[in-house]
Amino acid sequence: MKKTQTWIVTCIYLQLLLFNPLVKTKGLCRNRVTDDVKDVTKLVANLPKDYKIALKYVPGMDVLPSHCWISVMVEQLSVSLTDLLDKFSNISEGLSNYSIIDKLVKIVDDLVECVEGHSSENVKKSSKSPEPRLFTPEEFFRIFNRSIDAFKDLEMVASKTSECVVSSTLSPEKDSRVSVTKPFMLPPVAASSLRNDSSSSNRKATNPIEDSSIQWAVMALPACFSLVIGFAFGAFYWKKKQPNLTRTVENIQINEEDNEISMLQEKEREFQEV
């Protein structure tokens, strides 16, 4: 009985071990983004429109897949936001500029950590080095918004086959996402994350069901595999132990019958002697 319990516990731990990839799959970078990003609207309104923020920008990030530039951009955003934080005093007000920027720095630092731990086949480097440039608050936080939004597509299988090559005809001045004339658009209620510009939103709106199906399939396969393996081991063990259990029961019954016969014979001899 003790061996049976030990084997059952072993099977349970084996299923948990095989089920572990499902838990890891759900640990997406998007979970690092908190609702603190909704304070960006207030921060942009508080900063002067002609204020310049230094940032090393990846050329062509508007045409390249997100996995080509996201690792570089989050690092550069972390540096720029940290420098911006140093320029403000630590005011105790809950929604002061310092407090908002400090929360954004923590979010970006978490994303940097997530990218560093990401598989190299999903995150690649752009062929061009980032260029130091100056951006207005609207332009800077538009890039911030797109970088935050890019983590939603980081797990896409299609991105693995995309090349990180920028056309030689592309110039930074033609980048629509950093154009001064482009309005700074944010949703009225920024709850979970900030949307990027209309082209990225339209692109994602065409396949949300397909993306969700792929993610659920990736998560379900390890779970199904672990359950099948666990049941297979359990069935094999039960089939192997069943004959032994049957023989054990038969032996116990035979021993009991032999004991009863011996007792009857003993009583019969005692009766004859009397």
UniProtKB/Swiss-Prot annotation:
It comes from the Eukaryota. One of its GO terms (cellular component) is filopodium. Residues 1-25 form the signal peptide. Disulfide bonds join 29-114, 68-164. Pfam families: SCF (PF02404). Residues 26-215 are extracellular. GO terms for biological process: cell adhesion; positive regulation of cell population proliferation. Keywords: Cell adhesion, Cell membrane, Cell projection, Cytoplasm, Cytoskeleton, Disulfide bond, Glycoprotein, Growth factor, Membrane, Secreted, Signal, Transmembrane, Transmembrane helix. GO terms for molecular function: cytokine activity; growth factor activity; stem cell factor receptor binding. A soluble form is produced by proteolytic processing of isoform 1 in the extracellular domain. Homodimer, non-covalently linked. Stimulates the proliferation of mast cells. Able to augment the proliferation of both myeloid and lymphoid hematopoietic progenitors in bone marrow culture. Also mediates cell-cell adhesion. Acts synergistically with other cytokines, probably interleukins. Belongs to the SCF family. PANTHER family: KIT LIGAND (PTHR11574:SF0). This is Kit ligand.
